[in-house]
Amino acid sequence: MDYVVLLKQVPDLAEELEIDAAGTGLDREWMSFVASEWDEYALEEALLLRDARGGTVTCLALGVAAGDVDELLATCLTRGADRVVKVGTFEHAPDSHTAAAAFSGALAHLHYDLVLTGVQAIDDLDGQVGPLVATNLGLPHVSVVTHIAVAGHGSTVTVHQEYAGGIVGEFEVQLPAVLCVQTSREAPRYAPVSRVRQLMKTATIEAMVGGDGGGSGLVVEAMTIPETGSTAEMINGSPQVIAERIAAILAERGIGSGVAR
């Protein structure tokens, strides 16, 4: 079976994020980027399936000016991917609709049985790329996937989908399909930095134009850092005293007026 993994670079939250001069987005000029956590789970799941059943794993990532997609793709090779492809050339990070169109265009030139991607990314949290790719290609899809098992005949997969309250749904999905992964069975495998650097110099990173999309039509008018409150009240005393003070604060704000005091 042939697996394709769609990956994205996102801001590294270990560093301080700053708003750009226009006040409509993050300042990406000096920002550090890392692979989206959920995309790493998708890659690990694809590698586990490939290792168990054979086949190939191809990784696709969008070529965005800010960031280092070559390092991302070299990391994929270090972890065990068979082929890596940089899709398109974007001056700025594309929205979900544009990204999905680019990926869909590239997938039209590849053979695949299963397309995997992360359920969402930290810089948008909308979870749209996977479903949009599936829609563009006319494929079935399942999101929030926590388990994947390929049937013996290789024409379907059984997947588990996570719901609120610890409920898990089980679905049988006809291949080819798109799955948006919430977590993998094992932690993403380690990629030594020295090996990544070596592959960045020697590995073949293919390039594809990708599909052209009109975008979502959404415009960010303003982005601000959340305001921090100036005061906080520390409540000390016995449980009875603390409970009475909490009830009083709620009553002052018109919340829970029926709470016994």
Where are these regions (language model features)?
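N-terminal glycine-rich FAD/FM-binding segment characteristic of electron-transfer flavoproteins
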Residues: M1-R261
